[in-house]
């Protein structure tokens, strides 16, 4: 849980409380660990800034995004990453045995950097799609400004989900069957490579 205490509330925020439900806004680290990235934490804080009328702080965050991204969008970052992955596979496939590990490491470093850029673009898009250039609004499933009367009607519950509601499920644009086919193809390729490697190892005995 995140708590933001406001000792100097604006008059229009008297007897009101901002609730943010960030349960569905996180980055998966592994099967048992989720976390907020730096950009995600700053986005959550930006919602608080807008609630408090601190639009200059929201604008400062947008400027930070734009300095990092320039003209890069989610679409262009994804296209660049996909192109790099294709080129990396070709480079690794054509590399000599001696150079393969070095090229794999170089390609991975490039892909990691592109992944970071793509994630930054996604967080910028997430923020601006909801709040544009800096105007607070209640967002279903994410945030809501509730009055003391509304809180009283809910028996003074301080659970954000009781106020923000449930957002509609978003279509991530990924075709499940197509993705499963890709995974099976990748597993088949890895299995074939493992068999070849095992054959080479056995030859040395």
Residue ranges and their predicted role:
Residues 1-204:
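A conserved structural/catalytic subdomain of Rossmann-like adenosyl-cofactor enzymes
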């Amino acid at each position: 849980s995140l708590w933001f205490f406001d000792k100097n509330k604006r008059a229009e925020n008297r007897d009101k409380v901002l609730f943010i439900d960030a349960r569905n806004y996180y980055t998966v680290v592994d099967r048992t660990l989720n976390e907020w990235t730096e950009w995600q934490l700053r986005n959550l804080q930006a919602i608080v800034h807008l609630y408090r009328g601190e639009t200059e702080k929201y604008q400062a965050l947008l400027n930070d995004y734009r300095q990092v991204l320039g003209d890069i969008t989610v679409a262009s970052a994804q296209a660049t990453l996909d192109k790099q992955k294709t080129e990396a596979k070709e480079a690794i496939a054509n590399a000599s045995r001696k150079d393969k590990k070095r090229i794999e490491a170089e390609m991975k470093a490039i892909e990691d950097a592109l992944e970071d850029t793509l994630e930054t673009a996604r967080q910028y898009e997430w923020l601006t799609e909801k709040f544009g250039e800096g105007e607070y609004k209640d967002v279903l499933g994410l945030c809501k400004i509730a009055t003391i009367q509304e809180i009283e009607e809910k028996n003074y519950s301080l659970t954000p989900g009781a106020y923000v509601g449930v957002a509609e499920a978003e279509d991530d644009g990924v075709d499940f069957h197509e993705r499963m086919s890709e995974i099976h193809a990748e597993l088949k390729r890895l299995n074939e490579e493992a068999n070849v490697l095992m054959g080479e190892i056995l030859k040395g005995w």
